[in-house]
């Protein structure tokens, strides 16, 4: 799909499927606010993810677990208003994707009704098949998330590379059979991601999953140098915006201290 074609219509589940079928890579980045989402949308990003990673990169938590459904709705509303062309997917936070089926369906319905967003992301594979089917049956598109599942951190004992190819393929196939329109694969060996992609007909989106997938997703703060502390092996710094902000703030402080800001041109008579 050319940039001009992207500008003509909204990216949908069908768009993503067509892209996968013709071998066109899908791009996906996180967004949590209006101005960032607007810039990413204008740049031609196919899918914006309002991730529960907001808990770590914006709120300062060490995990995604403290994030609430109301907080996800708050951020999703801003991103939904900003995106004119990108598809917007919203995470179901812990434990809203793990409680009873009706609760999850209601949370997914809130996303579609209140935020102008288009789908939800649900962590889990085979064990979530019934939930995925219930949500899709209620008219809520679901992106399944397999491999490393951050909401499962305490069960796994940390963030660990997932190597069980047989289980990963089974998870992907179960999610596809239940109606998931895409499978996101996190932190698995390239060989596993390739096997998953070959095993399903829906698009696969990788994060730390190598090249042999239908598309890629990263945390926007990571690629812009806005994340303090640990940066995952699988990310890449595309622009050091964090340092630019730091230098701009320092220059502002220096000029205010020196009484060189504001100048006459920046003042009213």
Curated annotation (Swiss-Prot):
Main localisation: cytoplasm
Active site, UniProt feature: 186 (proton acceptor)
Source species of the chain: Rhodopirellula baltica (strain DSM 10527 / NCIMB 13988 / SH1)
Broad EC category: transferase
Catalytic activities: 3-methyl-2-oxobutanoate + (6R)-5,10-methylene-5,6,7,8-tetrahydrofolate + H2O = 2-dehydropantoate + (6S)-5,6,7,8-tetrahydrofolate
Listed name of the protein: 3-methyl-2-oxobutanoate hydroxymethyltransferase
Keywords: Cytoplasm, Magnesium, Metal-binding, Pantothenate biosynthesis, Transferase
Any one GO BP annotation for this protein: pantothenate biosynthetic process
Pfam families, per database record: Pantoate_transf (PF02548)
GO molecular function, one term: 3-methyl-2-oxobutanoate hydroxymethyltransferase activity
Quaternary data: Homodecamer; pentamer of dimers.
GO cellular component labels: cytoplasm
Compartments it resides in: Cytoplasm
InterPro entries: Pantoate_hydroxy_MeTrfase, Pyrv/PenolPyrv_kinase-like_dom, Pyrv_kinase-like_dom_sf
Cofactor: binding details: Binds 1 Mg(2+) ion per subunit.
Residues noted as binding 3-methyl-2-oxobutanoate in the record, renumbered to the chain: 52-53, 91, 121
Signal peptide feature range: none
């Amino acid at each position: 799909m050319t940039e001009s074609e992207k500008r003509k219509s909204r990216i949908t589940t069908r768009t993503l499927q067509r892209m996968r079928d013709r071998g066109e890579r899908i791009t996906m980045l996180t967004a949590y606010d209006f101005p960032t989402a607007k810039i990413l949308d204008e740049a031609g990003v196919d899918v914006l993810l309002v991730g529960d990673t907001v808990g770590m990169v914006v709120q300062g938590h060490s995990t995604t677990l403290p994030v609430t459904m109301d907080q996800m709705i708050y951020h999703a509303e801003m991103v939904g208003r900003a995106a004119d062309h990108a598809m917007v997917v919203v995470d179901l936070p812990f434990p809203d994707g793990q409680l009873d089926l009706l609760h999850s369906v209601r949370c997914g319905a809130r996303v579609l009704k209140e935020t102008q967003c288009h789908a939800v992301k649900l962590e889990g594979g085979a064990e979530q098949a019934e939930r995925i089917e219930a949500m899709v049956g209620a008219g809520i598109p679901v992106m399944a998330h397999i491999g490393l599942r951050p909401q499962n951190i305490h069960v796994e004992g940390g963030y660990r590379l997932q190597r069980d190819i047989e289980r990963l393929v089974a998870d992907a196939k179960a999610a596809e059979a239940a109606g998931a329109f895409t499978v996101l694969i996190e932190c698995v060996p390239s060989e596993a991601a390739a096997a998953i992609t070959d095993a399903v007909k829906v698009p696969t989106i990788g994060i730390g999953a190598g090249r042999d997938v239908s598309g890629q997703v990263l945390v926007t703060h990571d690629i812009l140098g806005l994340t303090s502390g640990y940066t995952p092996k699988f990310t890449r710094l595309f622009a050091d915006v964090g340092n630019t902000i730091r230098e701009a703030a320092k220059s502002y402080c220096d000029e205010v201290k020196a009484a060189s800001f504001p100048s006459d041109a920046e003042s009213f008579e």
